[in-house]
Amino acid sequence: MENKPSVLTDKYDVGRLLGQGTFAKVYYGRSILTNQSVAIKMIDKEKVMKVGLIEQIKREISVMRIARHPNVVELYEVMATKTRIYFVMEYCKGGELFNKVAKGKLRDDVAWKYFYQLINAVDFCHSREVYHRDIKPENLLLDDNENLKVSDFGLSALADCKRQDGLLHTTCGTPAYVAPEVINRKGYDGTKADIWSCGVVLFVLLAGYLPFHDSNLMEMYRKIGKADFKAPSWFAPEVRRLLCKMLDPNPETRITIARIRESSWFRKGLHMKQKKMEKRVKEINSVEAGTAGTNENGAGPSENGAGPSENGDRVTEENHTDEPTNLNAFDLIALSAGFDLAGLFGDDNKRESRFTSQKPASVIISKLEEVAQRLKLSIRKREAGLFKLERLKEGRKGILSMDAEIFQVTPNFHLVEVKKSNGDTLEYQKLVAEDLRPALSDIVWVWQGEKDELTSQQETEYQQQQQQEQQEQEEPLKF
């Protein structure tokens, strides 16, 4: 590959070499506009075309665009010249996880953190039908905050790579981390193969060495095929049990990610993580309470009891009224499905749902609180007519949270918008479809998009309601 450019398309300064492979080199870069650090992967177009790998490059781009997750290296943009293809990616200052493990085994809590983040990333990719197929410490990077980032999707597979039997058939990956069914050149399930590799990574993090290793490659394959490994004496019993289930040579009986999350070792670490988070929240709240406890005149909290409730589920701000936002005709047009321009911008337009209701705002709020309690969601008021609902447990992409905002069209006619503010979009869609919609049915008049046109009965009801309210407004006051 020819010498690197010092500036890439007037957008990035290109700096030192970070690493290289057969067909590509990765350089440190910096955005000229924002000063943000990036990693720039330069691929020799001629080399990849000679060996027929251009489709693999295209697949890697597709996968990285699908797999947007906090624990997956983000692809910012792709550029190309006559001789090169450039991937501009998230820069991970901490380097490879391999470098940490090379110095020796990690503490249990540190190993748990990395394993937890790895499982979250892999689970998310699988939910998008993306299978990595080359999970190993060299492909797991660390950012500035020591958070894990899965990288190098060059060997990954999409669901459409499967044959008619529904299995993958390409042998790939690093031998010491590859599942037995992949080595045997049989069709394999990408999900199960990735779980095996995650099991090997977990062993390496806790032991500091590989579970399957031999100078003779065929002997190593034999050990992998029989799951012939010995756990060190310092491994806790619950870790041994989990590893035996992850490194099960039979893919049919190998543990699933859902069951990994339920394992005692995984839950124990999660419990410790939640305790730390709760402690941090209490510390933040105590600091905020100290600063908010006095006003400009040095007086304490007001006597009207307008502070947050003790249970923290419902927070009412002192300056906020209970009245929802009023909508005018232009607001309604902008919010209507027919005028929604979000689809033009290529984003997934499934992150929000709207419904209309003929119930008063107080009834809608009470119903939201009741449903939140039933679905084990926390709910708190942010401002007039706006509520934050959150799941108590982390999902594939962190805590799933959504905003429910009530808009007043008339005193007895409201529009409610439920919008995802954090977490996985697929989890949000499932929650809305399977839980929220049925639970809210008795206050919903119609969901947006459910019917393109209102039924004649609904139209008549709405017109009558509008006429009645107009008459009430026009009727002169009598003293």
UniProtKB/Swiss-Prot annotation:
In what residue span(s) does the Protein kinase domain sit?
A: 12-266
From which domain of life does this come?
Answer: Eukaryota
Specify residue ranges for compositional bias: Low complexity: 288-300, 457-470
Catalytic activity, reaction form? L-seryl-[protein] + ATP = O-phospho-L-seryl-[protein] + ADP + H(+); L-threonyl-[protein] + ATP = O-phospho-L-threonyl-[protein] + ADP + H(+)
Q: What induces it?
A: By salt stress.
The protein's matches in CDD domains, at most eight in alphabetical order, are given as: CIPK_C
Q: In the UniProt entry, which residues are flagged as the active site?
A: 134
Q: Where are the transmembrane segments?
A: none
**Which keywords describe this protein according to UniProt?**
ATP-binding, Kinase, Manganese, Nucleotide-binding, Phosphoprotein, Serine/threonine-protein kinase, Transferase
Phosphoserine: residues carrying this PTM: 156
What does the entry state regarding organ or tissue expression?
Mostly expressed in roots.
Q: Which InterPro entries match?
A: Kinase-like_dom_sf, NAF/FISL_domain, NAF_dom, Prot_kinase_dom, Protein_kinase_ATP_BS, Ser/Thr_kinase_AS
Q: What class of enzyme is it?
A: transferase
Q: What does this protein do?
A: CIPK serine-threonine protein kinases interact with CBL proteins. Binding of a CBL protein to the regulatory NAF domain of CIPK protein lead to the activation of the kinase in a calcium-dependent manner.
| Recorded domain comment | The activation loop within the kinase domain is the target of phosphorylation/activation by upstream protein kinases. The PPI motif mediates the interaction with the ABI (abscisic acid-insensitive) phosphatases.
Q: Which PANTHER family match?
A: CALCIUM/CALMODULIN-DEPENDENT PROTEIN KINASE KINASE-RELATED, CBL-INTERACTING SERINE_THREONINE-PROTEIN KINASE 10
Question: What is this protein's name?
Answer: CBL-interacting serine/threonine-protein kinase 10
